[in-house]
Amino acid sequence: TIGRRQRQMCIRDSNYSYPNCPIKFTNIIKSNNVPYWYFISLYKSVGEEYEWTDMLKQKKEITENFLNNKNVYFYSLISSGVPIGFFILDYRKKEICDISYIGLTKGNLGKGLGKYLFKTAFLMGWDTNYINKLTVNTCTLDHKAALPLYQKLGFEPVSYTHLTLPTTYGV
């Protein structure tokens, strides 16, 4: 088993502009009716090193209902036709956008794409008239650059949870 300290972070305002992508032929594409196989494949590719397990443990129908909810938006980061990352914006709670998942596949770390992806998700999350709070969850198992980036953009911790989980990937 592993223990992790999970934080919920929130921010209430933003005055940033959209960043330029650091790599040519790379785009963020919004997907509608995301196939389960596509999401799970990308989720595993991104989350394996960080013990992302919650979506693997729930029933397929629950994940599909989440992904295809009219208030949940799935975005893929595509480079030269290949998915290399993703993020999900969850607007199911009134006046709140939660960046519920965000990450890059292993071979795409250290290229400036994480900052680009998060800043874009951050700005897209605010890009509606009815949002007054943006949240993101992180934990001690996430990439070491995640928390400092969130704090640099103005996020502040609002809650902490301690979880003890069985390892899924053998980390």
Give, region by region, the residue ranges found by the protein language model.
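A conserved beta-strand-loop-helix scaffold within acyl/acetyltransferase catalytic domains
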Residues: 58, 78-79, 84-96, 101-102
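Acyl-donor-binding surface of acyltransferase catalytic domains
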Residues: 4-8, 12-27, 32
